[in-house]
């Protein structure tokens, strides 16, 4: 087994950077390894139009480390009040690359999300016309639906309707977690892709629940049983261009995770590519990591692939117990444990 792995610099097609005092920390972690990232818009208040996207973009650019060329790719947050004109202006901006569907109540800061998919059909039609991709948090939120089944219900009740009605609309089914989602994406047209997180490749619900609740593995969509984890690993290492890297790195302060009602989200951006390398190595598929991390995402979005490279070295290192997060700290995934790959510091 080689002790070094060189690949085109990857991009992250789904990340949460948060805002304010946290930005210098989250942006630095992302910029260390990624050239570009799709920036989630679920701030308070959310990023609803091109003007708000530009303001957030400028805050991110100001937080970049000295000399960094990290490029934030901005996203609009769809609401029941989003208009076709909002979409046209976003597309014309050149810096908004997608719009995000959060079903109301599905995840962090989603209260302003879409209450019924039919409410935005006019907006989706405009998105298809102008070529602005739709990003989807794929879960229903009805209280009678078991949390482990919400992704499948979303496919059957909503996503299948969207892809049938708008066959030219580019759709990214984000952070998929089930075999059902893998099969849906595989069967769909070339306009439908999916991101897969490192934590859903490395863990299943037993890791979160057996022997005690591990709050730093709690995320939404929640970890599923191991048969779904295996389906995700098969998809990520298959070489299919429909599946690409999206960390869904979602930091929360330590006190907000380690609480009676803890927040959902795993912080992985500090070592994202190392975590993916570990998952791919477990499948003896390190040769498939570069296409998944560096080729298929930009290809789907119609953007050029990066030209510079990064190098991973196979060496063990200890993950810190916590990392700075504004005036708070965040507990990263695998805190206090060891990782087996490390990005060269001069990459």
Swiss-Prot record:
The record places the active site at 248
The family annotation for this protein states: Belongs to the metallo-dependent hydrolases superfamily. DHOase family. Class II DHOase subfamily.
List GO terms (cellular component aspect).
Answer: cytosol
Give the pathway listed in the UniProt entry for this protein: Pyrimidine metabolism; UMP biosynthesis via de novo pathway; (S)-dihydroorotate from bicarbonate: step 3/3
CDD domains to which the protein is assigned, alphabetical: DHOase (cd01294)
Residues that hold substrate according to the record: 16-18, 42, 137, 220, 252, 264
| InterPro entries, per the entry | Amidohydro-rel (IPR006680), DHOdimr (IPR004721), Dihydroorotase_CS (IPR002195), Metal_Hydrolase (IPR032466)
Which positions does UniProt annotate for Zn(2+) 2 binding?
A: 100, 137, 175
Chain's role:
Catalyzes the reversible cyclization of carbamoyl aspartate to dihydroorotate.
- Identify this protein by name: Dihydroorotase
Q: Can you state the subunit structure given in the record?
A: Homodimer.
Question: What is the reaction catalyzed?
Answer: (S)-dihydroorotate + H2O = N-carbamoyl-L-aspartate + H(+)
Q: How is the cofactor bound?
A: Binds 2 Zn(2+) ions per subunit.
Binding positions for Zn(2+) 1?
14, 16, 100, 248
Biological-process GO terms, alphabetical: 'de novo' pyrimidine nucleobase biosynthetic process; 'de novo' UMP biosynthetic process
Give the EC number(s) listed in the UniProt record: 3.5.2.3
Key words, A-Z: Hydrolase, Metal-binding, Pyrimidine biosynthesis, Zinc
Q: What are the top taxonomic ranks of the organism?
A: Bacteria, Pseudomonadati, Pseudomonadota, Gammaproteobacteria, Pseudomonadales
Q: Which SUPFAM superfamilies match?
A: Metallo-dependent hydrolases
- Residues with the modification N6-carboxylysine, per the entry, are 100
């Amino acid at each position: 087994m080689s002790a070094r792995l060189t690949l085109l610099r990857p991009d992250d097609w789904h990340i949460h950077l948060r805002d304010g005092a946290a930005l210098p920390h989250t942006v630095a972690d992302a910029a260390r390894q990624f050239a570009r990232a799709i920036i989630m818009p679920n701030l308070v208040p959310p990023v609803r139009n091109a003007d708000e996207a530009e303001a957030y973009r400028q805050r991110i650019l100001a937080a970049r480390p000295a000399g960094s060329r990290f490029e934030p790719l901005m996203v609009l947050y769809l609401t029941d009040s989003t208009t076709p004109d909002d979409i046209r202006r976003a597309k014309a901006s050149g810096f908004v690359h997608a719009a995000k569907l959060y079903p109301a109540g599905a995840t962090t800061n989603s209260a302003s999300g879409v209450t019924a998919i039919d409410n935005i059909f006019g907006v989706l039609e405009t998105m298809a016309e102008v070529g602005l991709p739709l990003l989807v948090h794929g879960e229903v939120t009805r209280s009678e639906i078991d949390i482990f089944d919400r992704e499948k219900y979303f496919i059957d009740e909503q996503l299948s309707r969207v892809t049938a009605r708008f066959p030219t609309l580019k759709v990214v089914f984000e952070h998929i977690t089930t075999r059902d989602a893998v099969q849906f994406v595989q069967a769909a047209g070339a306009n439908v892709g999916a991101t897969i997180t490192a934590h859903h490749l490395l863990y299943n619900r037993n890791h979160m629940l057996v022997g005690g609740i591990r709050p730093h593995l709690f995320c939404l969509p929640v970890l599923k049983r191991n048969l779904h984890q295996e389906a995700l690993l098969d998809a990520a290492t298959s070489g299919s261009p429909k599946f690409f890297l999206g960390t869904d790195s979602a930091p929360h302060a330590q006190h907000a995770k380690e609480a009676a009602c803890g927040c959902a989200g795993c912080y992985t951006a500090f070592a994202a590519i190392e975590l993916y390398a570990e998952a791919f190595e477990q499948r003896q598929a390190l040769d498939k990591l570069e296409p998944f991390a560096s080729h298929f995402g930009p290809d789907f979005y119609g953007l050029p692939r990066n030209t510079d490279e990064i190098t991973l070295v196979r060496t063990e290192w200890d993950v810190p117990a916590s990392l700075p997060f504004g005036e708070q700290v965040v507990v990263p995934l695998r805190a206090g444990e060891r990782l087996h790959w490390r990005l060269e510091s001069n990459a």
